[in-house]
Regions:
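Glycine-rich catalytic cores of cysteine/serine-nucleophile enzymes that process amide/ester linkages
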Residues: 20-98, 137
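Short, structured beta-strand/loop micro-motifs enriched in basic residues and often containing a Trp
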Residues: 1-6
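A structural motif
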Residues: 101-134
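Solvent-exposed, acidic/flexible segments
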Residues: 51, 100-104, 146, 150
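Activation targets extended, charge/polar-rich intrinsically disordered C-terminal tails
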Residues: 131-196
Length: 196
């Protein structure tokens, strides 16, 4: 068994509906994301150096006895067993919402997007890369009816009532760690299995 498979087996025993999963990969696409996502702007508009470790994000839900992973993948919104998704990654961590009263609503909204076959927004990736490196936002470069993984999960967080992430226009997966439990929204989430 690989390290991620062992970690998955440990996590699966404690996984909860609505957990958010951050993924690390060593692919070329992930290397490019890390190149562009090496800082963030804090609430005081200060540029903070913060190298990116995680480059993909999803949420999980139980369907019968299977832990499924819902995310915006290169083919659009997908819903696959988490055991399939780990084959593409080398590490992951969990962001667990502490308030669960709206989790089922958020899960169902995401599954509705999957059933509607919402496509992936490749141009939004380019838009974020340009903003991260130049500070220039080309707003017409993305499609509001398509998703990338971080926008899909930001919408999920909105649907379950999390406030920590609503201020950021163009989030990356790593931003979900950077902005978890901002001081004004203490204890909205807990971070688990983060070996980074």
């Amino acid at each position: 068994m690989t390290a991620i498979e062992i970690k998955y087996e440990l996590y699966r025993n404690t996984a909860r509906n609505g957990d958010i999963i951050l993924w690390k990969s060593n692919s070329l696409a992930s290397d490019l994301i890390r190149y562009f996502d090496n800082f963030y702007i804090n609430a005081d508009d200060e540029k903070i150096k913060s190298p990116s470790y995680y480059t993909h994000i999803s949420y999980v839900h139980w369907h019968r006895n299977r832990l499924e992973n819902c995310d915006a993948w290169y083919e659009g919104i997908t819903n696959v067993p988490m055991s399939h998704r780990i084959k593409h990654y080398v590490d992951f961590c969990v962001i667990r919402p502490t308030k669960i009263n709206l989790v089922e609503h958020g899960i169902n909204e995401g599954l509705n997007e999957w059933e509607a076959q919402v496509k992936y927004d490749y141009f939004r990736l380019l838009r974020i890369a340009i903003v991260k490196k130049t500070g220039i936002d080309i707003t017409g470069l993305s499609n509001s009816k398509k998703y990338i993984c971080s926008l899909f999960i930001q919408k999920y967080c909105e649907n379950i009532g999390l406030k920590s992430y609503e201020f950021c226009k163009l989030m990356t997966p790593q931003d979900f760690i950077r902005f978890a439990n901002r001081s004004i929204y203490k204890e909205e989430v807990e971070i688990l299995l983060n070996d980074n």
